[in-house]
C-alpha cells in the first residue's frame, strides 16, 4: 500500500481516498436499508400471526370457559429495563411456555420507545385484558409501567421486573451499542466502529456516558407521566418506589437473578415450574453477554458517583434490593450453601360452625 502511494500522483491519491469513502458510505447505507427491511418483515410476520389467531377465534367462536378457570385468566407483564439480563430471563419463559401451557408475546414498540401514545395505551390495555386466546399470557418489552386501573379494567395484570446496579447497567449498554453481544454477533450496532472506552468517554465528558444516561430504571417504574422522564425528578423517584411496592408482584436484581427465578417458581408455578433447574443447567442460562466490555476504573466510577442523578438511581436500586432481600428472607432458608423454598407456613383452625 505504501509503495502504491509513492507511485500514485497526489490527485489520484485524493481520488482514491474519496472513492473509498463514498464506497464505505454506500455500503453502510445499504446495510441500514437491509436492517430496516428485516425489521419491516418481522413486523409483517407478527401482524400476520395475530390476524390468523383472530380469524380462528372468529370462526370457532369466543371461548366460553375463559372466566371459569381463574388459573387460566392470568397475564404477566415484564416491562424489561435494557441491559439487566432481561434476554436471559425472557428466554426461560420461551423455553417453558409449551411445557407449562401459556403464551409468550414480545411487545415491539417503534424505535424501542418506552412511552406509548394515549391511543396506543387504550389499545394495549384492551388487547391485554380481552385477548383470551393468549391467556395465560407472558408479555415482555421495553415499555414503562402503565397503570391499568385508570382505564377501568376489572382485573389488572401481574407486573414483574429486574433492575441492576446503575453504573454496571450503563457500562454494559455503552459497549453493547458498539460491539453487540454473543446473542446476535453479526448484527451491526448503532455505534459500531467507535473504539473509545467507557473510561475515555467519561474523561472527555462524552454524551453516551453522561450521568443523564443513568436515568432509566426510575422512569421505567414511574410510568407514563411527563414528570417521570424529567431527569433528576424527586417526584419520579418517589412514584417509582410507590409503584415497586404497590403495583409489582416481584422485582429482582440482576446480581441475584437465580433467587428471583426461584421465588417466581415457588409463587407462580403455573408459569415458572421448572425455571430454576433450567436456569442452572440450561444452555441459555447466561445467554446474552456484551462483547469487548471493559470494566471502568475506580476514578471513572467515583466521577459518576458525584452526580445527583447517580445518587437517585442508586437510592432506587438499593430500595429495590432491600425489598427483594426482605421477600427472599421470608420465603427461603439456607442449608449447606443451598437455598430451599419454605413449605406452607400457615393453616386454618377453630372453624365454626362445626359440621355434623
From Swiss-Prot:
GO terms for biological process: gene expression; heparan sulfate proteoglycan biosynthetic process; heparin proteoglycan metabolic process; ureteric bud formation. Signal peptide: none annotated. Adenosine 3',5'-bisphosphate binds at residues 83-88, 164, 172, 279, 285, 290, 293. Keywords: Coiled coil, Disulfide bond, Glycoprotein, Golgi apparatus, Membrane, Signal-anchor, Transferase, Transmembrane, Transmembrane helix. It is a single-pass type II membrane protein. Changing residue 86 to A: Loss of catalytic activity due to disruption of binding to the substrate 3'-phosphoadenylyl sulfate. Changing residue 164 to A: Severe reduction of catalytic activity due to disruption of binding to the substrate 3'-phosphoadenylyl sulfate. Disulfide bonds join 201-209, 222-228. The chain crosses the membrane at residues 12-28. SUPFAM superfamilies: P-loop containing nucleoside triphosphate hydrolases. Residues 24-51 form a coiled coil. Changing residue 178 to A: Severe reduction of catalytic activity but no effect on 3'-phosphoadenylyl sulfate substrate binding; probably disrupts binding to the polysaccharide substrate. Its EC number is 2.8.2.-. Changing residue 80 to A: Severe reduction of catalytic activity but no effect on 3'-phosphoadenylyl sulfate substrate binding; probably disrupts binding to the carboxyl group of the iduronic acid of the polysaccharide substrate. GO terms for cellular component: Golgi membrane. Catalyzes the transfer of a sulfo group from 3'-phospho-5'-adenylyl sulfate (PAPS) to the 2-OH position of iduronic acid (IdoA) or glucuronic acid (GlcA) within the heparan sulfate (HS) chain and participates in HS biosynthesis. Required for metanephric development of kidney formation, suggesting that 2-O-sulfation within HS is essential for signaling between ureteric bud and metanephric mesenchyme. Homotrimer. Interacts with the C5-epimerase GLCE. Belongs to the sulfotransferase 3 family. This is Heparan sulfate 2-O-sulfotransferase 1. It comes from Cricetulus griseus (Chinese hamster).
Amino acid at each position: 500500500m505504501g509503495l502504491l502511494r509513492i507511485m500514485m500522483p497526489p490527485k489520484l491519491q485524493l481520488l482514491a481516498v474519496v472513492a473509498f469513502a463514498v464506497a464505505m458510505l454506500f455500503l453502510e447505507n445499504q446495510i441500514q436499508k437491509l436492517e430496516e427491511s428485516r425489521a419491516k418483515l418481522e413486523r409483517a410476520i407478527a401482524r400476520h400471526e395475530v390476524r390468523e389467531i383472530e380469524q380462528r377465534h372468529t370462526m370457532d367462536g369466543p371461548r366460553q370457559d375463559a372466566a371459569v378457570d381463574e388459573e387460566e385468566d392470568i397475564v404477566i407483564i415484564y416491562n424489561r429495563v435494557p441491559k439487566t439480563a432481561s434476554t436471559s430471563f425472557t428466554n426461560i419463559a420461551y423455553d417453558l411456555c409449551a411445557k407449562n401451557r401459556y403464551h409468550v408475546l414480545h411487545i415491539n414498540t417503534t424505535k424501542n420507545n418506552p412511552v406509548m401514545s394515549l391511543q396506543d395505551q387504550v389499545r394495549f390495555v384492551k388487547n391485554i385484558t380481552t385477548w383470551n386466546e393468549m391467556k395465560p399470557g407472558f408479555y415482555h418489552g421495553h415499555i414503562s409501567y402503565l397503570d391499568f386501573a385508570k382505564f377501568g379494567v376489572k382485573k389488572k395484570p401481574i407486573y414483574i421486573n429486574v433492575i441492576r446496579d446503575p453504573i454496571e447497567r450503563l457500562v454494559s449498554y455503552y459497549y453493547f451499542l458498539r460491539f453487540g453481544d454473543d446473542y446476535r454477533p453479526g448484527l451491526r450496532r448503532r455505534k459500531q466502529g467507535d473504539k473509545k472506552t467507557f473510561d475515555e468517554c467519561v474523561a472527555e465528558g462524552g454524551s453516551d456516558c453522561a450521568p443523564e444516561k443513568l436515568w432509566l430504571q426510575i422512569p421505567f417504574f414511574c410510568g407514563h407521566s411527563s414528570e417521570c422522564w424529567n431527569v433528576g425528578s424527586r417526584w419520579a423517584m418517589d412514584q417509582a418506589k410507590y409503584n415497586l411496592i404497590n403495583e409489582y408482584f416481584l422485582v429482582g436484581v440482576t446480581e441475584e437473578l437465580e433467587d428471583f427465578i426461584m421465588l417466581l417458581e415457588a409463587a407462580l408455578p403455573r408459569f415458572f415450574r421448572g425455571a430454576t433447574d433450567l436456569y442452572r443447567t440450561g444452555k441459555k442460562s447466561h445467554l446474552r453477554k456484551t462483547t469487548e466490555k471493559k470494566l471502568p476504573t475506580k476514578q471513572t466510577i467515583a466521577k459518576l458517583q458525584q452526580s445527583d442523578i447517580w445518587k437517585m438511581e442508586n437510592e432506587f436500586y438499593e430500595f429495590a434490593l432491600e425489598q427483594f432481600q426482605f421477600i427472599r428472607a421470608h420465603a427461603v432458608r439456607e442449608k449447606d450453601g443451598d437455598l430451599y423454598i419454605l413449605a406452607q407456613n400457615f393453616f386454618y383452625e377453630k372453624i365454626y360452625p362445626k359440621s355434623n
